[in-house]
Amino acid sequence: YGLTGGGGLSLPNFRGKGQSFTFSYNEGISSGSQNSYVYQGINVDRPKNRRISIGFTDPMVNDTKNLLGASIGYDMRGGGSAMYYSPLETTTAYGSFMWGRIFKWPDDFFRGTWRIMMRRRSYSGSQADLEKYVGGLTKTDGISFVQTIKRDSRDHPEFPTLGSHFSLNTTLSGWILGGQENFQKHVMNLEWYTPTFWKFVLMSSFKIGIAKELPARDGSSSYIPFYDRFI
């Protein structure tokens, strides 16, 4: 159990041309209101979380099929050795720039986006957890290039009853781009929706992915962040 609070502002038609401006802030603490508790004889801090983000997206720049977007944010995820899902306290400051395009071929349902993201992460925790999850590092820089190709023919984006959604996401982090987070990651996701009877819809899905570590450009130590691994 825990307590989470926050708020946000969303302007879906900012400046009257379909542009989207968003701001959000969330903060929470898990497992009660005290600052720490005892787990198997070990005093463990309760995980705290804080997230702030600001983003802007223009889906049709100058009435063309091009998309432009940018975002900045700060993310803090608390943890301890007893919290397997977040073993380290991690703080991340990031910024990203995105360009997208609606394709004419094979059909109008296809589109692609390309994003450059820069981030700096700081880790704190026991030395054993630092060695296990981040190779003993306490601070890392990451530069990523992300390509997403997708086809979306769903009749409704939130509660679809017919159609399909396909996406192929490719991430290249570090390597020739620099930084300590050096890996490639590929994820393919398929979803399709079939009406059955009355208002019931059958959703079928298939997801597969692979992640592989890459060498650092300067020969220094590198690793795959545990948030980007498959567990």
Where do the protein language model's features map onto the residues?
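C-terminal outer-membrane beta-barrel translocator/porin domains of Gram-negative envelope proteins
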Residues: 1-3, 10, 129-231
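Gram-negative/organellar outer-membrane beta-barrel architecture
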Residues: 1-158, 165-166
